[in-house]
């Protein structure tokens, strides 16, 4: 049984064409929200429009690492729907390579999408969200609590997102706006398949068993419940919670366990 919390609310989601972003879009439209989403893949956005024909869905092709694309997305959302109640910064990209092998512009690309995309969209939507006493959400990662080997740039980008949102939350404490970040833990999505290698190209495969992970749909349901409850943070999956807990209380042991988890026979 769905609540009416999201009914008629305007929700802007970055990266809504697949994975967690698409699951959020699907669920929100089902619950009566008006949804705007952007992504880089025009074909997937077109499929999304077909799937939700007749529903209040606004889509736009945009690369969130580009400020003007973010401006066009946020401005057009307000033009179409009149306001933004909730902004979900979901667009993200990962990487997998040892830092010593890495070309530095790979990290710049990851920071551009994960951190600056969140920064740009939040700044552009902020006045409307404050006016509506709404919510700003960042889809972060366990890598934002604990640096992960082979994912130095990804970890840096998610630590940056968490720090930025924590500072913003404190600034907005008396404004009626809720600021939350979500760490999905290990959730089945395309982020690992599309993770950049040391040269900045997509890996094309996941090093993990995606079938054993939480589904994007289950993750989206948890996120929406947390938005409704106006939570500060949401850490999902047992592995995710355990990693955060261990890193806080036993950081030295966490180093060893994390290394063992990510390295097999000395290889990433």
Q: What kind of feature is each model-predicted range?
A:
Residues 10, 17-18:
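Conserved glycine-rich cofactor-binding loop
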Residues 98-99, 103-109:
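Substrate-binding pocket helix/loop in short-chain dehydrogenase/reductase
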């Amino acid at each position: 049984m769905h609540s009416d919390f999201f009914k008629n609310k305007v929700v802007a989601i970055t990266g809504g064409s697949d994975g967690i972003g698409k699951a959020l879009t699907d669920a929100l439209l089902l619950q009566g929200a008006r949804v705007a989403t952007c992504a880089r893949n025009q074909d997937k956005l077109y499929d999304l429009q077909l799937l939700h024909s007749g529903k209040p869905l606004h889509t736009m092709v945009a690369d969130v690492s580009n400020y003007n694309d973010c401006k066009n997305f946020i401005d057009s959302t307000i033009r179409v729907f009149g306001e933004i109640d909730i902004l979900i910064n979901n667009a993200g990209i990962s990487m997998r390579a040892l830092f010593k092998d890495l070309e530095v512009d790979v990290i710049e690309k990851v920071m551009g999408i994960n951190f600056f995309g969140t920064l740009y969209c939040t700044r552009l939507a902020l006045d409307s969200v404050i006016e509506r006493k709404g919510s700003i959400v960042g889809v972060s990662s366990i890598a934002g609590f604990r640096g992960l080997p082979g994912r130095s740039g990804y970890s840096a980008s998610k630590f940056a997102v968490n720090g930025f949102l924590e500072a913003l939350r404190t600034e907005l404490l008396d404004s009626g706006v809720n600021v939350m970040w979500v760490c999905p833990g290990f959730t089945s999505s395309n982020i690992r398949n599309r993770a950049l290698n040391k040269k900045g190209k997509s890996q094309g495969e996941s090093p993990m068993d995606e079938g054993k992970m939480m589904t994007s749909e289950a993750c989206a349901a948890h996120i929406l419940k947390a938005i409704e409850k106006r939570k500060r943070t949401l850490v999902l999956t047992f592995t995710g919670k355990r990693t955060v807990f261990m890193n806080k209380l036993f950081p030295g042991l966490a180093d060893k366990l994390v290394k063992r988890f990510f390295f097999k026979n000395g290889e990433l």
